[in-house]
Structure formats: C-alpha cells, structure tokens
C-alpha cells in the first residue's frame, strides 16, 4: 500500500493507493499551520489509522509547498509555517518508525501525470502549474529530477526573459515575488499574474475567469490582454522547453482550464525554440487537484 500526503497551507489531503495504483481511501484534515508537534501528530495519526484499516504498513510520501534543504534536510517553506526550518522527515520517521519521502508539491504533480497510463512510455514529462503561483517539475524516466539543491523544478523563480520585456513594452511592470526578488515568472504567468497584468494595463481589477469570459464575449480590452498574455506565455515556455527539452508537458492549476492555451501554444512556441527543435506535446493535466497526493504516494515506486 502506498500513502500520499499533500500538505498545503490550509488542508492536508491523504490518499491510499493499492498495488494497482488505484486510490482506495481519501481523507482531508485542516493543516496545523503554526503548531509543529500537532502537525507531526496529525500526519502520524492518519498513518496509524490506515495501517490498522488495511492491516499493513503503507509506504509514505509527502508533498508540500517548499523543499528540503539539500545539506541539512530542514524544510524550506512559506505556506506551512509550522514546518519551516524543521527536520520534518527525520521527525516523522522517528515518530512513525519507517521511511518517509518528501518532495516539492509541484514535482509530485508532475510525477502523478508521468505515471498516468497514457504517459508512462514518455521518457520525460514536465508538469507546469498555472494556478495561484507558477511552478513545475521534470520527470525523467519515471523519477523526479530535483538537482543538487532540490530546486530543479522551481521554474517560477526564473526571471522574465529579455524577449518578454520587449513584448510587454515600455510600460512593463516590475512585479515583486514572495521569494524576495523581482521579475520572477511566478508573478507573471500564474493566474494571479494574469490578473495583475490586466490591472496594470487597464487600471481595473478583474478575476481571471471574468477576463476570460469577457474575451469570449468580444470585449476589446480583454481580447488585447489575452493576446498579450498568450505571447508572453509562449516566450517563457520557449525558454523553459529549450533548457529542459521535455517530450510531454502537462498543465495544471486554474488557468490551465483556459482552452485557448492548447490552441495557441503549439502555434506560438516554435518561433522561440531552436530551429531544430519541435514543440513538445502540451496537454491538460488528467488528475487535477488529486495530482499532488498521487505523486506523493508514487515517490515510493520510482521516486
């Protein structure tokens, strides 16, 4: 049995998967964001509960919005303050009495998609999340590629490329990022970035869904904004794909439901790639919000 935990800022989602990788149990509980002992107890309690239910010791994987420090294995995270700077893996292993694997939640999302039946033959799968933030992960031959510092998938903290600044024009906003730097892709390509750019250029705040609906209805400002954003996305995807060269790219997060992306990217991205390169297949993520839990559980298969 494989246990997956998706530890977010407000909730912990648990999933149990059998040997056929079928989900056989689900539970959601509030995240004790500021109480580290309670966080440990909550996770350990769920493990004990489902060990008893399934009469076995499940293998444990955990995804969270952050990463482990590659040198001392303490957790680097903003959204789960209780775990910040703590040796979460070591403390969980001591409390539960078995191995625990921890990975960035975007990498878990990517791993979930890579292990979908339709993509298992793809040598490399990249998962990109266009949600509240922008980030992703690269899966190579069924394994998460984390890099020396466990930051290989932190694409949201790459800077906006020169082509993008030219495209956005003289009035381009220099947006700050939660990491403390400015100009990060996270601030521009996320659903939040989609809204911030609209507010910057048109002086009014609108939700992403309302901008998309206005575009479909023929609104001139919305149409201009969508055109600008699609080209911006293509420019940045071109840089990311050139550096990583994935076979398949799966998009998740709220903005990934904007169907126009799947029509426009195959047409726009190629001009930002090397002349010998082909644009990878770009698809909508199949497992949606459950991807983080699936990927966390699957860390113990090939992760």
Swiss-Prot record:
One of its GO terms (molecular function) is zinc ion binding. Gene3D superfamilies: 3.30.420.40. ATP binds at residues 4-11, 133-140. Its EC number is 2.7.1.59. Zn(2+) binds at residues 157, 177, 179, 184. One of its GO terms (biological process) is N-acetylglucosamine metabolic process. It holds the Pfam family ROK. It catalyses: N-acetyl-D-glucosamine + ATP = N-acetyl-D-glucosamine 6-phosphate + ADP + H(+). Pathway: Cell wall biogenesis; peptidoglycan recycling. Keywords: ATP-binding, Carbohydrate metabolism, Kinase, Metal-binding, Nucleotide-binding, Transferase, Zinc. NCBIfam families: PRK13310.1 (NF009835). PANTHER family: N-ACETYL-D-GLUCOSAMINE KINASE, ROK (REPRESSOR, ORF, KINASE) FAMILY. HAMAP family: GlcNAc_kinase. Belongs to the ROK (NagC/XylR) family. NagK subfamily. Catalyzes the phosphorylation of N-acetyl-D-glucosamine (GlcNAc) derived from cell-wall degradation, yielding GlcNAc-6-P. This is N-acetyl-D-glucosamine kinase. The gene is nagK.
């Amino acid at each position: 049995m494989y246990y997956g935990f998706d530890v977010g800022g407000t909730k912990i989602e648990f999933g149990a998967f059998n040997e056929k990788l079928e989900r056989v149990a689900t539970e959601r509980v509030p995240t004790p964001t500021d109480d580290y002992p309670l966080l440990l107890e909550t996770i350990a309690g769920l493990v004990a509960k489902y060990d008893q239910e399934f009469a076995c010791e499940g293998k444990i994987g955990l995804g969270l919005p952050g990463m482990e420090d590659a040198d001392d294995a303490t957790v680097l995270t903003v959204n789960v303050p209780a775990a910040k700077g703590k040796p979460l893996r070591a403390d969980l292993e001591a409390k539960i009495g078995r191995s625990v694997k921890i990975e960035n939640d975007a990498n878990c999302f990517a791993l979930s998609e890579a292990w979908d039946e339709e993509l298992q033959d793809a040598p490399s799968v990249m998962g990109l999340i266009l949600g509240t933030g922008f980030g992703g992960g690269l899966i190579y031959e069924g394994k998460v590629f984390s890099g020396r510092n466990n930051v290989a998938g932190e694409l949201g903290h790459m800077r906006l490329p020169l082509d993008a600044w030219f495209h956005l024009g003289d009035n381009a906003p220099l947006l700050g990022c939660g990491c403390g730097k400015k100009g990060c892709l996270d601030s521009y390509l996320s659903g939040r970035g989609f809204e911030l750019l609209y507010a910057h250029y048109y002086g009014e705040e609108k939700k992403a869904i309302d901008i998309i609906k206005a575009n479909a209805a023929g609104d001139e400002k919305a149409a201009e904004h969508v055109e600008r954003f699609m080209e911006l996305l293509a420019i940045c995807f071109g840089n990311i794909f050139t550096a990583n060269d994935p076979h398949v790219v799966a998009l998740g997060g709220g903005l990934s439901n904007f169907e126009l992306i799947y029509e426009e990217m195959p047409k726009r991205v190629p001009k930002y790639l090397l002349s010998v390169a082909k644009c990878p297949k770009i698809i909508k993520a199949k497992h949606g919000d459950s991807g983080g839990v699936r990927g966390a559980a699957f860390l113990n298969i090939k992760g």
